[in-house]
Swiss-Prot record:
Subcellular location: Cytoplasm, Cytoskeleton, Microtubule organizing center, Centrosome
Quaternary structure annotation from Swiss-Prot or TrEMBL: Interacts with MAP2K7 and GTP-bound NRAS.
Region listing for Disordered, in residue ranges: 87-123, 339-359
Main location: cytoplasm
Transmembrane annotation, as ranges: none
Residue intervals of the Ras-associating domain: 6-89
Pfam families on file: RA (PF00788)
CDD domains hit by this protein: RA_RASSF7
Biological function: Negatively regulates stress-induced JNK activation and apoptosis by promoting MAP2K7 phosphorylation and inhibiting its ability to activate JNK. Following prolonged stress, anti-apoptotic effect stops because of degradation of RASSF7 protein via the ubiquitin-proteasome pathway. Required for the activation of AURKB and chromosomal congression during mitosis where it stimulates microtubule polymerization.
Protein name: Ras association domain-containing protein 7
Length: 359
């Protein structure tokens, strides 16, 4: 049940139903609001009004003013909520009002609406509005209002509620204290880890600084040596002599390469000349084979006695030339068996007679 101050009105959630109490002022006590709400819902028992701000709750005292308690919250006054809770049965041991008819409406209850009957399947009840002001109405003399509903709450009950509220507050504070102790332990662990990492980084920084100093000293020493070497020329170092030897070797290799290129050019020229000579010899050999076949054909024709047509003038001229050519080259062609192969392949009809003519 939630209460909210809007134009001197309090919005209350009673068992999941929002109700509005009108005519509330700064002098209206919590006890009056609770009695009015209990009479409106037609229930008896012990009720408490709880002030809720976000997730924190505080039980209001009977003589405390809800409007004043809400005003003390300042800018969070609109977020204040009041919850009406039933803590137990009535002290007088009066049976529940559900089993007996409700009392007649008195001047206090005259402004309150009657309790709605529970109808199955009906929609949830809307917010109900009632007024704490007492209109000038004559109460019904038939059934008087029970004194338990309008009587003040005993001081012992108020003290008990105060003690319960203190216990609840102490429990919440203990819970918060345990939470903050855990957070403190976590922060201390994080701080220790951060200090360890800081120490490691400091050690690494010192080590790198020492290495940088050593490298700077080494660089200064090398620069001094270079300056001394540049100012005082001395005997050539091993590097210079090695470079000179490499230059000489390169020059020698270049000369050898030039000589090899010249030799290769001469060899290529000789190869070309040999190729030309071989081609000329092959042509000459073909001409000799052709002339030899002509001679063999003439000899065969003469032996068989056939009339040989007069040779052309070119053939007469070529025969002496072939004989002249054969006479100096006969010694060169003695070991070559190609002439017989060429002569035997002259014609397919002539070979048997040619063999007889050679015999």
């Amino acid at each position: 049940m939630v209460l909210e101050l809007v134009a001197m009105e309090l919005k209350v959630w009673v068992d999941g139903i929002q109700r509005v109490v009108c005519g509330v002022s700064e002098q209206t006590t919590c006890q009056e609001v609770v009695i009015a709400l209990a009479q409106a819902i037609g229930q008896t028992g012990r009720f408490v009004l709880v002030q809720r701000l976000r997730e924190k709750e505080r039980q209001l005292l009977p003589q405390e003013c809800p409007v004043g308690a809400q005003a003390t919250c300042g800018q969070f006054a609109n977020d204040v909520q009041f919850v009406l809770r039933r803590t137990g049965p009535s002290l007088s041991g009066r049976p529940s009002s559900d089993n007996c008819p409700p009392p007649e409406r008195c001047p206090v209850r005259a402004s309150l609406p009657p309790k709605p009957s529970a109808i199955p399947g009906r929609e949830p009840r809307k917010a109900l509005t009632f007024n704490l002001r007492c209109p000038k109405l004559v109460p019904s003399p038939s059934i008087p209002e029970p004194a338990a509903l309008v009587g003040p709450i005993p001081d012992g009950f108020a003290d008990l509620q105060d003690l319960e509220l203190r216990i609840q507050r102490n429990t919440e504070e203990l819970g918060h204290e345990a939470f903050w102790e855990q957070e403190l332990q976590r922060e201390q662990a994080r701080e220790r880890e951060g200090q360890a990492r800081l120490q490691a980084l400091s050690a690494a920084t010192a080590e790198h600084a020492a290495r940088l100093e050593a490298l700077d000293a080494q660089a200064c020493a090398l620069e001094a040596e270079l300056r001394l070497a540049a100012e005082a020329p001395g005997p050539p170092s091993a590097t210079a002599s090695a470079a000179e030897r490499l230059r000489q070797d390169l020059a020698t290799q270049e000369r050898h390469s030039l000589e090899m290129q010249g030799t290769l050019a001469l060899v290529s020229q000789a190869l070309e000349a040999a190729e030309h000579a071989l081609q000329a010899q092959a042509q000459e050999l073909e001409e000799l084979n052709r002339e030899l076949r002509q001679c063999n054909l003439q000899q065969f024709i003469q032996q068989t006695g056939a009339a040989l047509p007069p040779p052309p003038p070119q053939l007469d001229r070529t025969i002496p030339s072939t004989q002249d050519l054969l006479s100096p080259n006969r010694g060169e062609l003695q070991g070559v068996p190609q002439s017989h192969i060429l002569v035997s392949s002259l014609s397919p009809e002539v070979p048997p007679m040619r063999q007889s003519s050679w015999r």
